[in-house]
C-alpha cells in the first residue's frame, strides 16, 4: 500500500517508535494487539487515531498513558519515557475514556477535588482552577449534585474536568463520544475544540469520520494492530484519490 513520506518533527510532544503490545491467548499463544506502530504528535496538535474496533487504538493509548506496559518499542510523552518515567508521564497527561467511572455518592465538586489532591495540587491553586473548569464546562450549577444524579452528558463533562484538573499539556481521549446521544456528542466535541484553543496537545481514538473531519490536524489510520498511513485528511484524499471520507476509511482498513 502507498504511504506518505515520514517527515521528522522537531521537538514532538508525543513520539512513538516501533511500539508493540502482545498478550497470551487461552492456549498460551502470543496474540499481537499493537504491532510496531510509529507516529509523532506536534505540540498543540489534535491528532486522531482512526480505525475499526479491534484495530489497536485503545491499547496504543493505554500504553501512552502508562496503563499498559509496552512489550517492545519506545514512546515518550512531553519528553518522558512511558516505561522508565511513568510517574512523570502521568503528571503531564489527562486521560479520558468512554468508561471513565463516576462515583454515585460523591458530588461533582468532590470528585474533581479528589483527583486534584491525588495530583498534589496546593489548595490555593486547586480551588480557583476548579472554579474556572466548572465555569468553562458549564457545570457550576451541578457542583453539589451527586454522581448518581447526573445525566450521561454531565458525567462525561465531569470526566473531562477530572482529566484537566492538573492542567496537563497532553490530553488522551479514548473514544470520548462512544455510547452518547447526538446532542451529548456535540457538547463533548465543542469542549475538545475549546481545549484546542488553549494550546493543549490532544490525541484521541475514534471510528467516527465526522469527528475526524471537525477536529483533527492529522490522523494515523490503524488496522490489525498496525498504522496503515499517517497524514492530514487532504494528503490522504490526494494520495488515494478519494474525496468521500467514509469510502476512504473503508479502503484503508479493508
Show where each model-derived region lies.
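A short, flexible loop at the N-terminus of ABC-type nucleotide-binding domains that lies
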Residues: 9-16, 21-36, 43, 86
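Conserved ABC ATPase "signature" region
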Residues: 113, 117, 124-142, 190
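Conserved ABC ATPase signature
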Residues: 146-150
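Conserved catalytic motifs of ABC-family nucleotide-binding domains
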Residues: 167
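Catalytic Walker B motif of ABC-type/P-loop ATPase nucleotide-binding domains
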Residues: 171-174
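ABC ATPase "signature
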Residues: 230-231
